[in-house]
Amino acid sequence: MDNKPSGSKKIRQGDTVVAIAGNSRGQIGTVQSCKGDRVIVQGLNVRKKHVKRSQEAPKGRIVEIERPIHISNLKVCVEGETTAKLKVRTNEQGHRQFVYHKDDQEVVYRSVKKPK
């Protein structure tokens, strides 16, 4: 399995997203890392992991960690808790930008990274 994304990369590290499917549906978090089509979001898809006894943890313990969630189960939040569908537009200088519609106006979310 390769780690290349198969879909769009509208979500990147630092974005605020909301889960639209799964056990964490409706919860909001910040993207910590992206790898392929899976994203780790702070506070979403939290699982418990049982750690065996070792020198670092003499009694053992249970830790809660965020597990990756598929990018199709997330939606970008803009201006707090409102979600928006991002579209790619080219401005006058030829730069590509993600935009969303608000009150029949196109609002720029951020620019798309230029290909190398």
Curated annotation (Swiss-Prot):
Gene this protein is translated from: rplX
One cellular component term from this protein's GO annotations in UniProt: ribosome
Subunit structure: Part of the 50S ribosomal subunit.
Function description: One of two assembly initiator proteins, it binds directly to the 5'-end of the 23S rRNA, where it nucleates assembly of the 50S subunit.
Family recorded in the similarity comment: Belongs to the universal ribosomal protein uL24 family.
Cross-referenced Gene3D superfamilies: 2.30.30.30
Keyword Flavoprotein: no
Organism (species): Protochlamydia amoebophila (strain UWE25)
HAMAP family: Ribosomal_uL24_B
GO terms for MF: rRNA binding; structural constituent of ribosome
GO BP terms: translation
Lineage: Bacteria, Pseudomonadati, Chlamydiota, Chlamydiia, Parachlamydiales
Protein name: Large ribosomal subunit protein uL24
Keywords annotated in UniProt: Ribonucleoprotein, Ribosomal protein, RNA-binding, rRNA-binding
Signal peptide feature range: none
Domain of life where this protein originates: Bacteria
